[in-house]
């Protein structure tokens, strides 16, 4: 019974083999002549001859003995794969265990051959190399297992398994026959190392049953399934029409490309429409003819004795050819390396050369257009940007991911050879059209960037003296500013300043008014609607959105953000920009600091120093807010009354800072005065005693007080010494000063506190500095006006005039009747003072300020 079964199987396989040879001979025109293939791959052809010589003649004698059973065998179409037969002959017990576990069986080689003609050649060679001893082992399998496999055939995923051990090859070499020779062998299998192709379902069981000297390759058969489905539906064209279609397609693409060059538009939809709709394959990168030759040699080298890890490592480490496009990934390179074993047709080489020449022409035209738009330096930048844009487009169009790459040997890739030819021919043309459109957009953007760069580089060519002379008309102290600031204002603000002068508007500095704040908000909203940027935070704090930073920056340059942000505001645009950042900063409105926030701020400052931007992001506040708060709480700062030593250090620090800030011309004037009158003393202009003082430097010199404490204490000392110890804000004089202040503010009829001339207002009270008057007005409105934070400046002044002013006058009349006191007449303000009158240290320096109003004065 066993002998009959073995004869039946041998006869069936031989009969099916003859039928396949006849079908393959009809499709033979699809491949290259055997001489061409043997000349390109000499090592593969020699190995093929050795394998064909190992076929046994015993199989031919059994062809005419079991004709009926052969027909049943065809209906079943269940021949065992070489891997299964070898496993069952060598490890019968383990093979039975696998069947009991219900491991999904692999599809037969005959069904794969019917769907994929290139793989059928390999299947025939494997079946012919089997000995009768291996076939006898198949008769021992029960028929129930075969029926079970027949039922499960429809639900199984197509996989191919192959196991060739050194023992099997030794047996095959002993029984050789030289009368059957095949000259068209393209792909060969490693004769020394066994390879198993498995999928994820039977991977675990094969790891248990496989030997140590067998390499296992994990295969993604999704590509095989797609090609098989296309073959069954009959939508894929035949080999000859496909070859002819590729040539026609290349000709159509050339003609369309010429038309699109005239229109300066290169859409991919036209080329995609000419492609057969049945082909839906992932895009592949263009390869030159040199790459195809290199990959054919790699397929021959792959047949040597190497482990799978070493093969992949060598492929990853080898340098990428220059002819490959930059957007080709490592996973696509591995996939194309396996395809290289099946590439060798003359038609494909011709189409590759033609498409490569088209790509070279497009690159030449691209370089010419870039060279006309920009200089030689900018051309390289444009090329890199165009390549980056091309990489993005290729990745977005569906590049092959690394986990989806089919890491199978060259012989398994032959099943999709014809499909890959058409796909590569089409996809080589796609980057050509994309490069044209990308080069145009890149050249335009590069021209804009270069114009901006040239505009910035022109700052160094600006004559500093000429810029100072022209800007001095609008900013008298422009020469005191840094050279870079002067050049920037000359470039960005001089034209705006001239327009405001023609309108009769003076250039402003200092605190922004409410009207200016509203104009800034309007300008920002208009620019957002113009550019389509989502929020003001993205516009003004672009660094917080690194993914959109380049796009937002380009939009700001394109639509002249500097002009839009400063529209209608007579200030330098940089100051307007800083004010807008403060207004629209979402972290700038967090309320007061609590104890926990203060502790965090100190801890972060100990770690990061004065990196206020980083610290502000960590505590969710603006950089200005954390810097200002730390200046108040940082270090060991004293509270309460000032000591005599602290007051003396403060006076000395202010004097040093003022002298340090003086210009050389002013110092020369002081020196000339000393030479004329050696016994005299140096004088100082009034404004220099309270304007332009760096309170941060003063704080560093005092060491025990923060800058706000230093500024407040200096205002008190300066007021006392400018009035020679007079009490301008005590008793009835304080009440009269408040009444005068409210009346003068009501007469000014201004809409914002920034519009007030505090110098003129201070003269109405006496010879006092403007900061003193500002401090008194703040205390007055805070004490008398309820909810003053929510009121506008005109509303505050109206409330003081209607409600507080009558009460203050009534109180002043009562005090005048009781004490019969006299009100001092305000002294005229001096324009300069002697240094000895201001910067002297006496015994009463440590006393508290006598100018502080009492509780009764505030009421």
Swiss-Prot record:
Q: Where is this region: May be involved in localization to the nucleolus and interaction with ARF?
A: 121-210
Key word Ubl conjugation present? yes
What are the boundaries of the region N-terminal region (NRD)?
Answer: 1-210
Compositional bias annotation for Basic and acidic residues: 400-411, 419-436
Which residue intervals make up region (Disordered)?
1-184, 225-244, 255-462
Write out the GO cellular component annotations: fibrillar center; nucleolus; nucleoplasm; nucleus
Which InterPro entries does the UniProt entry name for this protein? SANT/Myb, TTF1-like
Which residue intervals make up region (May be involved in interaction with ARF)? 471-859
The primary location reported for this protein is: nucleus
PROSITE patterns in the cross-refs: MYB_LIKE (PS50090)
Where in this protein does the record say Phosphoserine is found? 227, 375, 437, 451, 457, 460, 845
- List locations, semicolon-separated: Nucleus; Nucleus, Nucleolus; Nucleus, Nucleoplasm
- Residues in Myb-like domain copies: 585-634, 634-718
Which Gene Ontology BP terms does the record give? chromatin remodeling; negative regulation of DNA replication; termination of RNA polymerase I transcription; transcription by RNA polymerase I; transcription initiation at RNA polymerase I promoter
What GO MF annotations does this protein's record show? chromatin binding; DNA binding
Give the Low complexity compositional bias ranges: 274-289, 370-383
Cross-link named Glycyl lysine isopeptide (Lys-Gly) (interchain with G-Cter in SUMO2), sites:
673
Tell me the subunit arrangement: Oligomer. The oligomeric structure enables to interact simultaneously with two separate DNA fragments. Interacts with BAZ2A/TIP5. Interacts with CAVIN1. Interacts (via the N-terminal region (NRD) and a C-terminal region) with CDKN2A/ARF; the interaction is direct. Interacts (via C-terminal region) with NPM1/B23.
Matches recorded under PANTHER family: TRANSCRIPTION TERMINATION FACTOR 1
What's its job?
A: Multifunctional nucleolar protein that terminates ribosomal gene transcription, mediates replication fork arrest and regulates RNA polymerase I transcription on chromatin. Plays a dual role in rDNA regulation, being involved in both activation and silencing of rDNA transcription. Interaction with BAZ2A/TIP5 recovers DNA-binding activity.
Q: What is known of its domains?
A: The N-terminal region (NRD) inhibits DNA-binding via its interaction with the C-terminal region.
Record-given protein name = Transcription termination factor 1
Source organism of the structure: Mus musculus
User: Gene encoding this chain?
Assistant: Ttf1
């Amino acid at each position: 019974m066993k002998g009959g079964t073995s004869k039946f199987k041998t006869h069936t396989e031989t009969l099916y083999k003859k039928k396949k040879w006849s079908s393959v001979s009809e499709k033979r025109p699809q491949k290259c002549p055997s001489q061409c293939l043997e000349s390109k791959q000499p090592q593969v052809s020699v190995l093929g001859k050795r394998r064909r010589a190992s076929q046994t003649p015993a199989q031919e004698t059994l062809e005419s003995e079991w004709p009926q059973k052969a027909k049943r065998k065809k209906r079943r179409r269940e021949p065992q794969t070489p891997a299964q037969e070898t496993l069952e002959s060598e490890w019968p017990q383990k093979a039975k265990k696998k069947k009991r576990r219900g491991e999904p069986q692999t599809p037969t080689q005959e069904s794969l051959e019917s769907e994929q003609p290139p793989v059928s050649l390999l299947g025939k060679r494997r079946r012919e190399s089997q000995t009768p001893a291996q076939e006898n082992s198949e008769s021992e399998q029960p028929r129930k297992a075969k029926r079970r496999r027949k039922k499960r055939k429809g639900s199984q995923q197509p996989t191919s398994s192959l196991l060739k051990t050194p023992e099997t090859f030794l047996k095959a070499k002993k029984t050789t026959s030289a009368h059957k020779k095949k000259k068209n062998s393209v792909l060969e299998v490693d004769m020394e190392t066994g390879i198993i192709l498995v999928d994820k379902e039977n991977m675990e069981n094969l790891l248990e049953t496989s030997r140590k000297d067998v390499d296992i390759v994990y295969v993604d058969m999704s590509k095989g399934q797609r090609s098989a489905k296309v073959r069954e539906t009959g939508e894929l064209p035949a080999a000859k029409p496909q070859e002819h279609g590729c040539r026609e397609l290349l000709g159509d693409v050339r003609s369309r490309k010429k038309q699109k060059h005239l229109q300066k538009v290169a859409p991919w939809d036209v080329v995609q429409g000419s492609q057969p709709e049945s082909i839906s394959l992932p895009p592949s990168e263009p390869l030159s003819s040199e790459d195809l030759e290199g990959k054919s040699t790699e397929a021959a080298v792959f047949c040597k004795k190497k482990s799978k890890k070493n093969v992949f490592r060598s492929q990853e480490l080898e340098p990428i050819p220059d002819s490959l496009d930059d957007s080709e990934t490592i996973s696509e390179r591995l996939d194309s390396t396996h395809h290289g074993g099946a590439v060798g047709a003359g038609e494909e080489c011709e189409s590759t050369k033609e498409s490569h020449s088209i790509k070279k022409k497009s690159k030449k035209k691209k370089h010419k257009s870039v060279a006309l738009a920009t200089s030689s330096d900018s051309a390289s930048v444009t090329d890199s940007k165009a390549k980056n844009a091309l990489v993005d487009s290729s990745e977005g169009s569906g590049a092959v991911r690394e986990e989806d790459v089919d890491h199978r040997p060259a012989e398994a890739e032959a099943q999709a050879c014809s499909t890959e030819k058409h796909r590569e021919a089409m996809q080589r043309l796609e980057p050509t059209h994309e490069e044209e459109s990308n080069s145009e957009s890149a050249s335009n953007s590069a021209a804009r960037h270069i114009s901006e760069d040239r505009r910035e580089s022109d700052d160094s060519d600006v004559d500093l003296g000429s810029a100072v002379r022209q800007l001095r008309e609008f900013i008298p102290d422009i020469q005191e500013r840094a050279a870079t600031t002067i050049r920037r204002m000359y470039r960005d603000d001089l034209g705006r300043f001239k327009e405001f002068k023609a309108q009769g508007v003076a250039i402003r500095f200092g605190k922004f008014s409410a009207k200016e704040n509203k104009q800034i908000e309007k300008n920002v909203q208009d620019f957002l609607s113009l550019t389509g940027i989502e929020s003001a935070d993205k516009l003004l704090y672009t660094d917080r959105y690194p993914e959109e930073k380049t796009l937002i920056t380009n939009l700001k340059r394109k639509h002249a953000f500097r002009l839009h942000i400063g529209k209608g505001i007579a200030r330098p645009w940089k100051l307007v920009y800083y004010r807008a950042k403060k207004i629209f900063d979402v972290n700038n409105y967090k309320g007061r600091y609590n104890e926990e926030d203060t502790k965090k701020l100190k801890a972060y400052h100990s770690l990061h120093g004065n990196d206020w931007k980083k610290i502000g992001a960590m505590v969710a506040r603006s950089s200005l807010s954390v810097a200002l708060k730390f200046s108040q709480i940082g270090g060991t700062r004293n509270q309460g009354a000032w000591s005599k030593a602290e007051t003396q250090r403060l006076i000395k620090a202010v004097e040093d800072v003022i002298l340090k800030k003086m210009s050389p011309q002013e110092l020369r004037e002081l020196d000339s005065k000393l030479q004329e009158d050696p016994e005299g003393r140096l004088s100082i202009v009034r404004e220099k005693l309270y304007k332009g003082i760096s309170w941060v430097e003063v704080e560093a010199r005092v060491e025990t007080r923060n800058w706000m404490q230093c500024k407040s204490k200096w205002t008190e000392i300066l007021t006392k010494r400018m009035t020679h110890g007079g009490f301008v804000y005590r008793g009835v004089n304080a009440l009269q000063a408040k009444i005068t202040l409210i009346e003068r503010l009501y007469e000014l009829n201004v809409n914002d506190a920034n519009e007030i001339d505090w110098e003129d207002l201070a003269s109405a009270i006496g010879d006092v500095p403007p900061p003193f008057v500002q401090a008194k007005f703040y205390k007055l409105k805070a004490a008398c006006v309820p909810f003053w934070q929510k009121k506008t400046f005109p509303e505050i002044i109206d409330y003081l005039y209607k409600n507080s002013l009558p009460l203050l006058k009534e109180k002043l009349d009562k005090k005048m009747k009781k004490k019969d006191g006299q009100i001092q007449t305000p002294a005229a303000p001096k324009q300069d003072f002697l240094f000895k009158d201001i910067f002297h240290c006496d015994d009463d320096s440590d006393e508290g300020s006598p100018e502080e109003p009492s509780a009764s004065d505030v009421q």
